[in-house]
């Protein structure tokens, strides 16, 4: 089984996908004049604007729902495996994926908002919606929907569950079978409650767990601050093959950095737009910018915290393509959460081991919940045409079964299946956003023009020449106005003009 999964991964995660992720991210960055740098301050402001409505959630709730998917086991176990198979330089390439991927996240999340719909009283959107409405290729949209349901419902939850089981067993000696049963019960309570319960749970848990983890990591880094310059130099030299010990795995550093970067921050994967489309906003670009910043939170903050902890303490291993040990800093511990637990425990005895296990539990559990929401959204897309309500119930059963199975299986198999799911979605989504990116950048220019005039930007797809954005033409009735009394028609009249930014 492991050999088959590995062979499939070798095809999906070929160099073509690696360079496509980096190349398209670079092109979008240049095309937008590096919006991920120009609008950082504005991104932070937008995170706290807006409020939930009967059909949608606030910008902050949408952000936390997206972070629930982005911030998961990839931020802990994923970083450990990236360093193991790609060396310290893999962390640099994770940073590159985050920086360039922010532009990808902007494009896909903006498109998700442009083409979203209201289904059964809730906002739904994502690649399947913008592929059908923007490209007019229904079979491609259905293909993405089916692949996403399969990936998020069956292939990817096992990675998160496996890391939860491994970390709890290391810290508390809890049998993985008990953990599997516990996860199934907790999941059933959340996923049978609908999108509002998912948003409420995520907005309460995600900010605190991420902030707490970063603070503890920063304390460890501060204690070892004299080691930081050397670690940064090691990362830099390893990233480009200048470090003698890791020069032979330069290609592995790039591959594992990109693979784990995409797995962690989800940029270009097509999962982020599902949650961002649920936000009630006056202009799609607002969520596009918020989601671009969420990539930074995931990788530049949380993943970096993990990477620095491992490299500063020296408690990690690196192996070559042939499996030969290139560096051994920790013996008898499999690549994954055990590295991070050992590193933190070495600096904070009696605390670190348990803290990582608890943090990872919340990271991974909220990610599984996010996977459910993503898969459910694609079922909602399919049900617009065939109307099979039982598909949602079947998804819930499959998700819980996948979680239980992943908890008790080997880590290699769990990660392999997860990588297949991520890779399939990335291929399909990147092709779509390359073909549709002009609509996102037309929307960006419109937003920047209105914002420069001191207006609260309002979206008018007709004026911008964007077709099939049906929600914005007549269904947008319960959105909260940021500036009461400022009508859409006035904004439309005033928003024509040159981009002034």
Please give the residue ranges for each predicted region.
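Alpha-helical membrane segments and immediately flanking helix-loop junctions
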Residues: 53-85, 111-114, 119-128, 132, ...
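Membrane-interface loop-to-helix entry segments
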Residues: 20-44, 162-168, 174-236, 376, ...
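Transmembrane helix-loop junctions in multi-pass membrane proteins
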Residues: 31-36, 74-79, 88, 154-165, ...
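Extracellular/periplasmic helix-exit of transmembrane alpha-helices
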Residues: 29, 106-115, 120, 218-234, ...
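Extracellular loop-to-transmembrane helix junctions
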Residues: 6-42, 46, 82-122, 298-305, ...
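Helix-loop-helix module between adjacent transmembrane segments
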Residues: 24-29, 97-121, 127-191, 359-369, ...
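N-terminal alpha-helical transmembrane segments of multi-pass membrane transport
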Residues: 1-73, 83-89, 434-501
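Flexible loop linkers connecting adjacent transmembrane helices
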Residues: 34-59, 81-83, 87-91, 95, ...
């Amino acid at each position: 089984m492991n050999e088959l999964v590995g062979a499939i991964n070798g095809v999906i995660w070929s160099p073509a996908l690696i360079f496509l992720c980096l190349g398209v991210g670079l092109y979008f960055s240049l095309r937008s004049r590096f919006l991920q740098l120009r609008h950082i301050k504005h991104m932070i402001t937008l995170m706290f604007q807006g409020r939930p409505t009967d059909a949608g959630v606030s910008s902050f709730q949408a952000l936390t729902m997206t972070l629930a998917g982005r911030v998961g086991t990839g931020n802990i176990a994923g970083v450990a495996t990236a360093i193991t198979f790609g060396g310290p330089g893999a962390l640099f390439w994770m940073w590159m994926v985050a920086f360039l991927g922010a532009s990808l996240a902007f494009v896909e999340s903006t498109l998700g908002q442009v083409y979203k719909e209201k289904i059964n009283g809730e906002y739904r959107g994502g690649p399947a919606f913008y592929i059908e409405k923007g490209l007019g290729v229904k079979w491609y949209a259905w293909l993405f929907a089916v692949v996403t349901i399969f990936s998020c419902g069956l292939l990817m939850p096992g990675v998160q569950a496996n890391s939860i089981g491994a970390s709890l067993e290391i810290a508390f000696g809890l049998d993985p079978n008990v953990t599997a049963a516990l996860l199934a019960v907790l999941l059933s309570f959340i996923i049978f409650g609908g999108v509002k319960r998912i948003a409420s749970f995520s907005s309460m848990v995600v900010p605190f767990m991420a902030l707490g983890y970063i603070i503890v990591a920063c304390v460890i880094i501060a204690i070892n601050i004299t080691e930081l310059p050397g670690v940064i130099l090691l990362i830099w030299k390893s990233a480009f093959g200048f470090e003698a010990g890791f020069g032979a795995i330069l290609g592995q550093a790039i591959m594992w950095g990109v693979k784990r970067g995409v797995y962690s921050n989800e940029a270009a994967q097509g999962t982020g737009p599902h949650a961002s489309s649920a936000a009630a906003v006056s202009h799609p670009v607002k969520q596009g910018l918020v989601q671009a910043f969420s990539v930074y939170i995931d990788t530049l903050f949380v993943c970096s915290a993990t990477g620095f902890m491992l490299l500063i303490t020296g408690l990690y291993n690196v192996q070559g393509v042939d499996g030969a040990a290139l560096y051994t800093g920790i013996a008898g511990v499999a690549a994954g959460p055990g590295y991070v637990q050992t590193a933190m425990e070495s600096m904070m005895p009696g605390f670190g081991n348990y803290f990582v296990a608890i943090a990872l539990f919340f990271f991974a559990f909220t990610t599984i919940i996010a996977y459910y929401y993503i898969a459910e959204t694609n079922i909602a897309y399919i049900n617009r045409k065939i109307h099979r309500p039982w598909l949602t119930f079947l998804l819930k059963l499959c998700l819980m079964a996948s979680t239980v199975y992943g908890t008790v299986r080997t880590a290699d198999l769990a990660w392999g299946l997860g990588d297949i799911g991520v890779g399939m979605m990335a291929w399909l989504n990147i092709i779509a956003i390359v073909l549709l990116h002009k609509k996102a950048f037309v929307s960006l220019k419109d937003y920047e023009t209105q914002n420069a005039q001191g207006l609260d930007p309002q979206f008018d797809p007709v004026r911008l020449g964007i077709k099939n954005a049906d929600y914005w033409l007549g269904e947008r009735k319960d959105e909260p106005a940021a500036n009461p009394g400022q009508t859409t028609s006035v904004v439309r009249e005033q928003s024509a003009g040159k981009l002034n930014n």
